[in-house]
Design a protein with these regions (language model features):
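Short alpha-helix boundary/capping and kink motifs at helix termini
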Residues: 1-88, 92-101, 105, 119
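Charge-dense polyanion-binding interfaces
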Residues: 107-121
């Protein structure tokens, strides 16, 4: 069985970073929703008006009470947090975009970066 390594970039305020999720805080991923979004992306591309909401990971990891993981579920060390945006809203779109990028690479299509809006906590 092929192991899938997911990868996608998020862009907020012209800054490109990797994706982070808060372990135990972000809701569980519903793969049915991801598949529906992915199917739409394959037909229409990513609708740029559907921005995900993010914060800079280093702004939330400093207190130590939030555990961040990357899109593959690997822990993010505090010293690496500045390479990530924590996705607050848009987990399903982000996962679908990473699967789209894998499909795009196999089909000669252009990969996408997920548009995001940075919010304040």
């Amino acid at each position: 069985m092929k192991k899938i390594y997911l990868e996608v970039k998020v862009v907020a305020n012209n800054e490109v970073r990797n994706v982070a999720f808060a372990k135990g805080i972000n809701r569980a991923i519903n793969l049915g929703n991801v598949e529906k979004i992915l199917a739409m992306m394959k037909v229409k591309g990513y609708r740029k008006a559907e921005m995900v909401q993010v914060v800079k990971a280093e702004d939330v990891i400093t207190t130590g009470d939030i555990r961040l993981v990357d899109i593959n579920g690997q822990d993010i060390n505090p010293e690496d947090a500045a390479k990530y945006f924590l996705v607050l809203d848009g987990q399903h779109r982000t996962i679908a975009a990473s699967l789209y990028n894998e499909w795009a690479a196999e089909n000669g299509e252009e990969a996408i970066n997920v548009p995001a809006i940075e919010v304040e906590l």
